[in-house]
Amino acid sequence: MVYRCYIKILIDIFVAVLSLIALMPVFGVIAVAIKWDSEGPVLFKQKRCGQYGRTFLIYKFRTMYKTAPYDRPVKELKNPEQYITRTGRVLRRTSLDELPQIFNMIKGEMSLIGPRPFLLAEGEVLAAREKAGITAVRPGITGLAQINGRNRISNDEKVVFDRKYVENICFLTDAAIFFKTIHYVIKRQDIYEGMLEEECQKLGQAPKTFRKWQEDNQ
């Protein structure tokens, strides 16, 4: 409890400030590349569901054209590649588009490690997360679900992983997730754009339905 309520917050602030200072040159290079590649702002802002169900604006480097659907998850788009810019492809494959969430950490809206925040439009999975107690903690830049399948698993499976994380928050868990995330990013593992259920089945990774998740967790 001490780690979750105090030490984890202090670590987040320290890491966020240090990262912001160290990565300023990287931010500058990415900003120039985005502006050179396509019209639109450097940062993409989107409403997400945060701790205790509070709405907040998440920050990302913009990776899509202005014509892209704003409030639809990428996995629901049949051909997401048509909306992603050339610079955006690089940023998404390397997860560099997530770097601006350092500002969310400084504002106290996000943690380095925690359940990824969902869109407000994803009401069904948000209800499941609230029921599972996941919204009791701050959302994270990376989490247990991200090192156990990321885009390859369904939202319902992510709920299971996120609940497991919330029930077992500790420094060792966070450290393990952090280093495994770095490993996954370097390998570019489990990053699929617009993955459909039938495509998951071809990979032998068919996602569970929400009803099945409810039956397993009643």
Tell where the protein language model's regions lie, with residue ranges.
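Juxtamembrane loop-helix boundary motifs flanking transmembrane segments in multi-pass membrane proteins
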Residues: V2-Y6, N79-Y83, E98
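Short, conserved beta-strand/loop elements in beta-sheet-dominated catalytic cores
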Residues: R89-S111
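Short, glycine-rich, amphipathic interfacial segments at transmembrane boundaries or analogous
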Residues: F44-Y83, I141-V160
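Hydrophobic alpha-helix-in-membranes signature
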Residues: M24, L99, G114-R116
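A hydrophobic, helix-centered structural microdomain
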Residues: M1-K66, A176-Q218
